[in-house]
């Protein structure tokens, strides 16, 4: 309504500078309040510190400049990831930083990151094995997990079908054999008892 009165540009700029999230508190702390971030310099410092932490432990460090547009996107991605069942489809031109900013948001959230490595011989069998790993880790791991999958990794149409099933139904039909299901139940049993 306000934008239609000719004040749209002012309010759009102000809305872009509204930052809310729990990412200002370090990920290892139990109490992470969801608050408005009013100090943009503090937010920039937090993203740069998270980037430095990631680069210290990563085999593939990232060289990113944390300008305001990038910080806005990291904030959005971090908020989405922290939602229960949070997932995001990031659309844009190649090289625009979607993966790098997602990795940084994952670091800020304190989540584990899982990415597949595509090789020439990578097919449905390897894909299913990787999916099993990520599903078991997500269900039995001690911290939440982000599965980062890029459009450049779609070697087979079945990859997209499996991701669609995970997002819509919460499972990939017939991915686990009966004996694997028994082993999984034994592995996640203690974790499930803690949660409930």
Located regions from the model:
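Single conserved hydrophobic/aromatic residue that forms the stacking wall/gate
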Residues: 1-11
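Short glycine-/polar-rich loops that comprise or flank the Walker A/P-loop
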Residues: 7, 85-86, 109-112, 143-144, ...
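Terminal-proximal interaction/regulatory segments of ATP-powered molecular machines
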Residues: 14, 31-120, 128-131
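Substrate-gripping "pore-loop 1 plus following alpha2 helix"
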Residues: 69-70, 126-130, 165-196
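Conserved catalytic network of the ASCE P-loop NTPase/AAA+ motor domain
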Residues: 81-83, 106-108, 136-142, 155-157
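Conserved nucleotide-binding/hydrolysis micro-motifs of P-loop NTPases
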Residues: 95-96, 120-122, 152-156, 173, ...
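Conserved alpha-helical scaffold flanking the Walker A/P-loop in AAA+ ATPase domains
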Residues: 126-148
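Walker B catalytic acidic pair
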Residues: 150-151, 162
